[in-house]
Amino acid sequence: TDEVAFDAFEAFSNAYDKLGNLRPTIEPKATEHIPGMISLIQELIDTGHAYESGGDVYFGVRSFAEYGKLSRHSVDDLRAGDRVEPGDLKRDPLDFALWKAAKPGEPQWDSPWGPGRPGWHIECSAMATEYLGPGFDIHAGGSDLIFPHHENEIAQSEAPHGETFARYWMHNGMLNLSGEKMAKSTGHVVTLLGALERWDPLAGRLFYLRTHYRKPLEFSTDALDDAEASLARLRAFRRRMPEVVEDASDADALDAFKAAMDNDLDVAGALGVVFDV
């Protein structure tokens, strides 16, 4: 599993660099933060929001009155089986795992509840809290993670002390191929590194930016070709920037550009202003 994780991280990092993105200040690894996860789980047990059952530990969803506020789900409307983990050890079908008892062939760590591994929601809360504190400004992620992952993050992070976990949530739309979400597990995917071998990396960035981040994005060779043509136009615009800046009549364009960027980071709208100048 370490080898698989390393290979995936290397591929991600290489693509990140080719796109010209700045590296994150911290890139924490879940397996290096197990003690922090155990500590948070114990705090949830101590405050009455979690319970041990057969070596597993579950978060009691109904113990957190605000559960569902991000996804706008009502607890009473949620059904077992609707993206909810099944399990006979739960007090309530909606409860989710914070710690799972060890199974043969799976990674495991020692804990007060016996050997096992953390649930996939608690990892993010523990690492975010360690590096950003109990409350921070912006949490981003794919729109497919709103429920249950981000909803569960909020619950397990806010339940012990009541402080807001993240003040702003930015959820990006899915990247689709032939109308379906890309998924490596099914082979329905075009890798970013593969695409960057064919197209200018800056065209790749422009391809992403020309659609508002909350909307789904359709991958196609035509779309990337068009992004390269648009990139050429932007480079031409950059070359004539001095004369554009000297033209006072473009003050309205600058205001429109700023207004678009201030409107939920509407880069696509801001680029439209640039292309109209």
Where are these regions (language model features)?
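Hydrophobic face of alpha-helices
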Residues: 2-5, 9, 125, 254, ...
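Helix-loop elements that line ligand-binding/catalytic pockets
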Residues: 216-219, 223-277
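An acidic site on a long C-lobe helix of protein kinase domains
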Residues: 8, 32-36, 270
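Short secondary-structure capping/junction motifs at helix and strand boundaries
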Residues: 13-28, 47-56
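N-terminal, positively charged nucleic-acid-binding surface of large information/translation enzymes
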Residues: 1-22, 40
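Hydrophobic/basic alpha-helical segments enriched in Actinobacteria
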Residues: 29, 48-52, 184, 194, ...
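Alpha-helical recognition segments enriched in aromatics with Gly/Pro capping
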Residues: 35-242
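The substrate-binding groove and active-site-proximal loops of carbohydrate-active enzymes
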Residues: 1-2, 25-31, 142-143
